[in-house]
Amino acid sequence: MSVSPAAPASGIRRPCYLVLSAHDFRTPRRANIHFITDQLALRGTTRFFSLRYSRLSRMKGDMRLPLDDTANTVVSHNGVDCYLWRTTVHPFNTRRSWLRPVEDAMFRWYAAHPPKQLLDWMRESDVIVFESGIAVAFIELAKRVNPAAKLVYRASDGLSTINVASYIEREFDRVAPTLDVIALVSPAMAAEVASRDNVFHVGHGVDHNLDQLGDPSPYAEGIHAVAVGSMLFDPEFFVVASKAFPQVTFHVIGSGMGRHPGYGDNVIVYGEMKHAQTIGYIKHARFGIAPYASEQVPVYLADSSMKLLQYDFFGLPAVCPNAVVGPYKSRFGYTPGNADSVIAAITQALEAPRVRYRQCLNWSDTTDRVLDPRAYPETRLYPHPPTAAPQLSSEAALSH
């Protein structure tokens, strides 16, 4: 049952926020939308509505499966009301152009049959945040249900990169100009957004006390390198690196893969780890690794990769594919699949100083900019259209 936001004793009503995402706020693995939601919960009543979950999710090993027993009920977690919407099936990208009419119909039906809980939460919201992906299908619904709500689109990823269905791409092109804010994690995403005046660059943030976390070191004596996350994970990197650098211990955290038979004894593989626990492994490493399996990664990852941001924050030299080196001095690029370039990049990282070159905002400052980027001129990607000077009538002009 939905509970309307209550006014505090002061009589000033706290704002009400709603986040729509294919993530769930309660999962151990955290993305940027989780940290933004943390900040929203400090500012007002906050709800998190989780989409794209059904019986099909079992086939893909969805990370929300441990929450299945709580589906279709409101659960309070760390000050946020959470709702995991489980349907019998959910729409998906069939990757078959001849099935596009069926695919479109699936998405339209899904968006047209929301649960009452979502409708109630939309009506009560002052601000609705849509994360890139399937949440796009519900923007039009939000506009109809609550025309007064501020609509914010958080582009955590480019839609073409995460292989959303054509319906979602076309729908976003249609509704983009009507949104109040489109907040991109990288300027490189702007080219595929069919709007300009409401488009801003707001990168990821870091925990305000991140530099105070992660002590003591989890490592024994010696040289240690760390890789965190599963995105496009390339085990072959560690097959090469572990043999070429036996003096380095490589720590692989949350790759989503087991131990590769080609790994040396100096590779330690960990399963999923809570975000706070990974900080020590990053903070005390000699260098960090972003082992993406291909150069065919989106250019915006140079700015948007959470692991690279955390390496940058701690001044860690980072080894990553050439495509995501970007303008960052502390990164050393290699070509995936090319052993010589992997070895050269690691050699450079081992010799590099530990210097923080990148300015990193905390999550509070980041959330300020996501909600109201116009208050921060540096976030604007396109020049503000000039205000037309008032036109004088011909009679007024002649009188001057």
Curated annotation (Swiss-Prot):
Disruption phenotype: Cells lacking this gene accumulate Man-alpha-1,3-Glc-beta-1,4-Glc-PP-polyisoprenyl, are unable to produce GlcA-Man-Glc(2)-PP-Pol, and show a decrease in xanthan production of more than 95%. Belongs to the glycosyltransferase 70 family. GO terms for molecular function: glucuronosyltransferase activity. It is found in: Cell inner membrane. Pathway: Glycan biosynthesis; xanthan biosynthesis. Pfam families: GumK_N. GO terms for biological process: polysaccharide biosynthetic process. It is a peripheral membrane protein. Keywords: Carbohydrate metabolism, Cell inner membrane, Cell membrane, Glycosyltransferase, Membrane, Transferase. Its main location: membrane. It catalyses: alpha-D-Man-(1->3)-beta-D-Glc-(1->4)-alpha-D-Glc-1-di-trans,octa-cis-undecaprenyl diphosphate + UDP-alpha-D-glucuronate = beta-D-GlcA-(1->2)-alpha-D-Man-(1->3)-beta-D-Glc-(1->4)-alpha-D-Glc-di-trans,octa-cis-undecaprenyl diphosphate + UDP + H(+). The active site is at 157 (proton acceptor). It comes from the Bacteria. UDP-alpha-D-glucuronate binds at residues 230-231, 272-273, 292, 306-310. The keyword ATP-binding does not apply. InterPro entries: GumK_N. One of its GO terms (cellular component) is plasma membrane. This is UDP-glucuronate:glycolipid 2-beta-glucuronosyltransferase. Residues 377-400 are annotated as: Disordered. Residues 390-400 have a biased composition (Polar residues). Catalyzes the transfer of a glucuronic acid (GlcA) residue from UDP-glucuronate to mannose-alpha-1,3-glucose-beta-1,4-glucose-P-P-polyisoprenyl to form the lipid-linked tetrasaccharide GlcA-Man-Glc(2)-PP-Pol, with a glucuronic acid-beta-mannose linkage. Is involved in the biosynthesis of the exopolysaccharide xanthan, since it catalyzes the fourth glycosylation step in the assembly of the pentasaccharide-P-P-polyisoprenyl repeating unit of xanthan. Is unable to use the trisaccharide acceptor freed from the pyrophosphate lipid moiety. SUPFAM superfamilies: UDP-Glycosyltransferase/glycogen phosphorylase (SSF53756).
